Design a protein with these regions (language model features):
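Metal-centered catalytic cores of metalloenzymes
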Residues: 2-80, 84-151
């Protein structure tokens, strides 16, 4: 009887541990979007610039990984963010992806840790309510290129 109870307890512990690992490593959800100056709001953004944003939202790890590239942005790129707002509207920053000093044709990748799991869940549930944009100085500090997620 003791052996059966001990086996049951060990078996349950293994199942719980494996469930926790599966939740923590959810494989992430990829989201990609094309970035253009025409998408910026309020516009105009950079009319000659383009870009690409590839995100992986890892809810169980509280992490957003990104690979963002852009071309022909006027000035110096200094930041990239995820904002919350529908297409055509500006919105507040919800995740700061990168900052620094980059050329008008460049790329950057990395992961942002300690992102609220509920925010990641919300983005995964309704990606079209969020957008990625890249900011440049001196002409487009509010955003040079933008792409709505889920489109």
């Amino acid at each position: 009887m003791r052996r059966s109870l001990a086996s049951l307890v060990v078996g349950l512990a293994v199942v719980v541990a494996l469930a926790g690992v599966a939740a923590a490593d959810d494989g992430g959800r990829p989201l990609s979007t094309t970035l253009t100056g025409a998408e910026e709001a309020p516009g105009p953004g950079d009319p000659n610039a383009t870009g690409q944003s590839d995100l992986t939202l890892n809810q169980g790890q509280n992490e957003v990984c990104f690979d963002i590239s852009w071309a022909d942005v006027d000035g110096t790129v200094f930041a990239g963010h995820i904002h919350v707002a529908p297409a055509g509207d500006p919105g507040p920053i919800v995740v700061s992806l990168f900052s620094g000093s980059f050329t008008g044709t460049d790329s950057v990748s990395g992961c942002v840790e300690n992102v609220d799991a509920e925010l990641i869940k919300a983005i995964r549930h309704d990606p079209s309510a969020y957008y990625v944009n890249v900011h440049s100085r001196p002409n487009f500090p509010g955003g040079a290129v933008r792409g709505q997620l889920g489109h």
